[in-house]
């Protein structure tokens, strides 16, 4: 058993918070942290007549109640929240394309003959100054720079006035050198703005900090509308909550950040963890402090001496003149003739560890590529652990292991399962399933609403979908709220008052097929089979049963030799049903984690059920057994295939009728002489359009859009109308008002406050935004007869047949199998449906290539179709085609991931390339970092040293970040771009 040792220390942010708020009156604190969580309150004091959130563990935290046993977080509206440390750039006077002058103007290069100057919010064209030759004096590449500036000057129609300030001339010189490639662009210098400083700045601006927490909209120094400052703590486990307090991010748009803001830098060694970061588009923009790294809590004092031969020196962006620096306490950066000294709070002080708390848990990281360590850092924070905080009755919706802390050491074998080599498909024993038994605690809390009914009792067993209780809130448009159970479970506790309710549900479960597991080496996979009769081997004459089987295909390309080292690198003869395998298999003990990604939380199916009374489409959400959305991209594929019968069947669920005057074409007018069947979505969009002054006429089977004549609408003196009829528009105090059923809570408030111009904007949003009626109801559709779950392999199935989750009888013999995002025509295939015995969707692995799917947690959808015409149509247009994959080239049941086996897999084209083999067993060799080649002499089998490992971290970060930076625009964004272009 591995025990997590999480210290309760801080890294300096608490001292900064205490310094800012040392004079706060502690008598203004009304509640304790536990009371705030129970009653959805905020743990605050009063400071300068404003609510000041109290940092848990600070000097203001007088209650000493610490629900998480951690320091540095806040409680807002009953939710534990962390505040990120924001990395802000220190000012340097030049970069590759701009220079900052002493008069606060900015020179920017767009191209060599197009330069601008920005001053006092005005941007004008800028030419070289009359004394441009003075710029060259400060260059080490005088000839090259002079030649270029001469060319630019020859195109100048008018020279700018001379620049006399020496620092300005130096800044321009260095800017031009960077632009021309004569000088390296200076690296980014930064400091961290911690929670205390952020909150102090907000209060200083006389703004509400609580509102910043609630809306997640902050101001960081001069940068407004920053949305990445505060986050709800996820409470997956203690190490995840700890790291959320030590998180660092950038204030700008993170998904669009350039590569230079994402890289692993030498200057960050022992300061910022090189492996723990988010993957995807945020890679490198979210990082974490190293294990014992701290930040400075006070502004430094420096000793300088005036000297004519000194450097132009700036201290915290204040110009000191030409000086010689006699202090070594601050960060000093000299760039030729300019010296920058940064001695402000928020600078990171090096520690003794290369990695964060999470990264330091990886004992064999030097035997693995850093990219695998990056993945496993994220998985550790998602692991189900045995911490008592997360199994109690404090936090909402938590999971915890009943036995163990961070996973369990299991007896592992690296081998195929009866000749089937299916990557990421894990086979476990029934014993392991029970060993990882976990407890889920679900807490329902209601405050300041009237509790009408509670329909359950203590110790009662609950089934998913059961009605738990009913509340009444007159402040909402939907005043009565029914709350249903999202999971099976047992009622542990009920506390009921007139306007307060706490209801606790407990569920214990074993691991089951479809749950996700991972080693500490990034070898993740889905439990695909729970086997009673597992293989075994003999150790000192005693029979040792295998707990978990991982496929050898997982090793050649991932190169995770650290897992083999952890297992002891031993090979033994393994027996399957008393038959001895011909070759020895790698076996040994290895730590495995059970992750939060469990099939219980993902499986969803529906044959019929509740329909939204307004949209007439199935309700949404797993807890209400809602329908799945057949989206815009899926619709476009059917249109591209010409599958009109299938489209008609899928879009036929919300049929409704409208009345039409054939003479005028008006819909639901005072006169009508015919009825027409149409989708309910049409009526909803029509109402929004009419509210915005537009109408649709249907005449002679053609439509036109005209201005809306609202003269025939009835007038009303109340806003409470239109509970069900979506076309029930009325005139209220001179404006066209939507019925209640189409109003959002915010729109209703705008109507009440008579803010009609803002109400018009809200109606436009309700119609046209990404979550608006047109996109959600017209471009896509929620459907009945649908299934969604995790996919697992079943090689015994026919290629065109799949097994659906147990109990998911959707009344269809055929269905459309789909994996989102649907990027091409192969993303939808017609398959036969067969009842399964698990909660997963089982498919033949030969289907994977078509959907670009694998078995590490991917989910797929099934949309059932019944009409004979649709089925016959899709048999022709979306027929399943067998694709041979790498998993089936080798047909050996005694393959393993030793040196011989890895080479065999590579040579036979099964998995990996020859360079993988060389990296593992010979030499990593040349790698490229920021367009520079370096040579790594070590290999993973012999463990690369810390210096080489850090260099490989740079490579891993650059490769991972480049994927998000260089990903082409697809789908919805592409449609927007095309529309803008046209």
From Swiss-Prot:
SMART domains in UniProt = RPOLA_N
Q: What is the lineage of its organism?
A: Eukaryota, Fungi, Dikarya, Ascomycota, Saccharomycotina
UniProt similarity note: Belongs to the RNA polymerase beta chain family.
Which catalysed reactions does the entry list for this protein? RNA(n) + a ribonucleoside 5'-triphosphate = RNA(n+1) + diphosphate
From the UniProt record, give one GO term of the biological process aspect: DNA-templated transcription
Has UniProt tagged this entry with the keyword Transferase? yes
EC number annotated for this UniProt entry: 2.7.7.6
Keywords of the record, alphabetical order, are: DNA-directed RNA polymerase, Nucleotidyltransferase, Plasmid, Transcription, Transferase
- Can you quote a single GO CC term? mitochondrion
Give the protein's recorded name.
Probable DNA-directed RNA polymerase
- The domain of life is Eukaryota
The scientific name of the source species is Kluyveromyces lactis (strain ATCC 8585 / CBS 2359 / DSM 70799 / NBRC 1267 / NRRL Y-1140 / WM37)
- One Pfam family from the record: RNA_pol_Rpb2_6
Protein task: The presence of the two linear plasmids, termed pGKL1 and pGKL2, in strains of Kluyveromyces lactis confers the killer phenotype to the host cell, by promoting the secretion of a toxin able to inhibit the growth of sensitive strains.
Q: Which Gene Ontology MF annotations are present?
A: DNA binding; DNA-directed RNA polymerase activity; ribonucleoside binding
Indicate whether Transferase appears among the record's keywords.
Answer: yes
């Amino acid at each position: 058993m591995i025990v997590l040792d999480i210290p309760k220390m801080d890294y300096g942010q608490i001292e900064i918070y205490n310094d800012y708020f040392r004079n706060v009156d502690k008598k203004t604190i009304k509640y304790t942290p536990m009371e705030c969580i129970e009653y959805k309150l905020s743990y605050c004091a009063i400071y300068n007549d404003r609510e000041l959130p109290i940092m848990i563990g600070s000097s203001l935290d007088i209650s000493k109640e610490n629900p998480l046993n951690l320091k540095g977080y806040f409680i807002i509206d009953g939710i534990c929240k962390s505040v990120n440390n924001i990395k802000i750039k220190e000012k340097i006077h030049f970069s590759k394309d701009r220079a900052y002058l002493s008069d606060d103007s900015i020179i920017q290069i767009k191209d060599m003959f197009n330069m601008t100057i920005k001053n006092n919010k005005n941007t004008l064209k800028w030419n070289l100054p009359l004394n441009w030759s003075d710029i060259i004096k400060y260059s080490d590449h005088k000839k090259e720079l002079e030649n270029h500036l001469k060319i630019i000057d020859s195109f100048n129609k008018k020279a700018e006035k001379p620049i006399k300030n020496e620092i300005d001339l130096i800044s321009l010189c260095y800017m031009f050198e960077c632009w021309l490639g004569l000088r390296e662009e200076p690296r980014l210098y930064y400091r961290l703005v911690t929670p205390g400083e952020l909150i102090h700045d907000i209060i200083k601006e006389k703004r509400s900090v609580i509102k910043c927490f609630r809306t997640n909209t902050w101001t960081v120094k001069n940068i407004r509308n920053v949305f990445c400052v505060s986050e709800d703590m996820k409470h997956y486990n203690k190490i995840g909550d700890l790291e959320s307090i030590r998180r660092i991010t950038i204030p700008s748009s993170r998904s669009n950040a350039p590569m230079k803001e994402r890289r692993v830098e030498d200057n960050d060694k022992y300061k910022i963890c090189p492996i723990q970061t988010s993957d995807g588009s945020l890679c490198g923009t979210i990082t974490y402090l190293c294990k014992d790294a701290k930040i400075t809590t006070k502004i430094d004092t420096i000793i300088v001496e005036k000297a004519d031969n000194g450097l132009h020196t700036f201290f915290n962006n204040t110009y000191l003149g030409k000086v010689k620096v006699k202090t070594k306490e601050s960060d000093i950066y000299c760039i030729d003739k300019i010296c920058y000294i940064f001695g402000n709070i928020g600078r990171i002080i090096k520690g003794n560890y290369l990695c964060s708390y999470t990264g330091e848990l990886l004992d064999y990281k030097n035997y693995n590529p850093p990219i695998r360590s990056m993945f496993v850092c994220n998985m550790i924070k998602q692991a189900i652990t045995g911490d008592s905080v997360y199994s109690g009755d404090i936090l909402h919706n938590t999971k915890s292991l009943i036995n163990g802390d961070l996973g369990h050491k299991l007896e592992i074998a690296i081998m195929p399962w009866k000749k089937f080599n299916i990557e990421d498909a894990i086979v476990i024993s029934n014993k392991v399933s029970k060993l990882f038994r976990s407890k889920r605690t679900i807490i329902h809390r209601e405050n300041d609403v009237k509790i009408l009914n509670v329909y359950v009792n203590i110790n009662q067993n609950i089934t998913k979908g059961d009605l738990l209780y009913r509340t009444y809130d007159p402040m909402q448009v939907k005043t009565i709220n029914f709350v249903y159970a999202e999971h099976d479970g047992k009622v542990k506790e009920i506390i009921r008052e007139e306007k307060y309710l706490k209801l606790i549900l407990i569920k214990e479960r074993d691991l089951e097929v479809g749950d996700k597991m991972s080693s500490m080496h990034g070898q993740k996979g889905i439990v695909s089979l729970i086997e009673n009769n597992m293989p075994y081997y003999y150790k000192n004459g005693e029979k040792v049963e295998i707990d978990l089987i991982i496929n050898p295909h997982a090793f050649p390309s991932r190169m995770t030799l650290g897992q083999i080292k952890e297992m002891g690198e031993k090979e033994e003869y393994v027996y399957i049903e008393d038959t001895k395998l011909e070759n020895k298999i790698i076996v040994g003990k290895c730590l495995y984690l059970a992750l939060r990604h469990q099939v219980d939380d993902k499986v969803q199916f529906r044959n019929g059920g509740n329909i939204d009374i307004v949209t007439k489409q199935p309700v949404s959400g797993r807890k209400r057994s809602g329908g799945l959305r057949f989206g815009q991209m899926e619709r476009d594929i059917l249109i591209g295939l010409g599958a009109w019968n299938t489209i008609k069947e899928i879009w036929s669920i919300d049929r409704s009728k409208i009345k039409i005057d054939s003479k005028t074409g008006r819909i639901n007018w005072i006169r009508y002489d015919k009825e027409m069947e149409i989708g309910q979505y049409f009526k909803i969009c029509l109402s929004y359009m009419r509210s915005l002054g537009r109408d649709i006429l249907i005449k002679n089977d053609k439509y036109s859009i005209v201005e809306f004549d609202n003269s025939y609408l009835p007038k009303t003196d109340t806003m409470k109308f239109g509970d069900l009829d979506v076309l029930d528009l009325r005139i209220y105090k001179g404006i066209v008002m939507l019925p209640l059923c189409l109003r959002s809570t915010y729109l209703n408030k705008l109507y009440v406050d008579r803010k009609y111009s803002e109400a018009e904007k809200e109606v436009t949003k309700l119609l046209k935004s990404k979550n608006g009626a047109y996109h959600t109801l017209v471009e896509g559709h929620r459907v009945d007869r649908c299934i969604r779950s995790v996919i697992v392999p079943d090689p015994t199935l026919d290629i065109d047949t799949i097994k659906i989750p147990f109990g998911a009888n959707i009344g269809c013999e055929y269905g459309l199998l789909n994996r989102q995002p649907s990027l091409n025509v192969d993303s939808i295939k017609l398959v036969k449906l067969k009842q399964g015995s698990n909660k997963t969707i089982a498919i033949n692995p030969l289907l994977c290539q078509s959907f670009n799917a694998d078995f590490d947690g991917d989910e797929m959808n099934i949309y059932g179709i019944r009409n004979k015409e649709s089925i016959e149509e899709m048999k022709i247009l979306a027929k399943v085609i067998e694709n041979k994959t790498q998993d089936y080239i080798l047909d050996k049941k005694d393959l393993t991931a030793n040196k011989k086996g890895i080479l065999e897999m590579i040579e036979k084209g099964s998995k990996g390339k020859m360079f993988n083999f060389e990296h593992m067993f010979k030499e990593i060799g040349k790698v490229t970092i920021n367009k520079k080649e370096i040579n790594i002499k070590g290999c993973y089998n012999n463990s690369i040293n810390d210096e080489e490992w850090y260099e490989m971290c740079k490579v891993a970060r650059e490769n991972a970040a480049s994927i998000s930076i260089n990903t082409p625009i697809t789908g919805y964004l592409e449609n927007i771009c095309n529309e803008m272009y046209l």
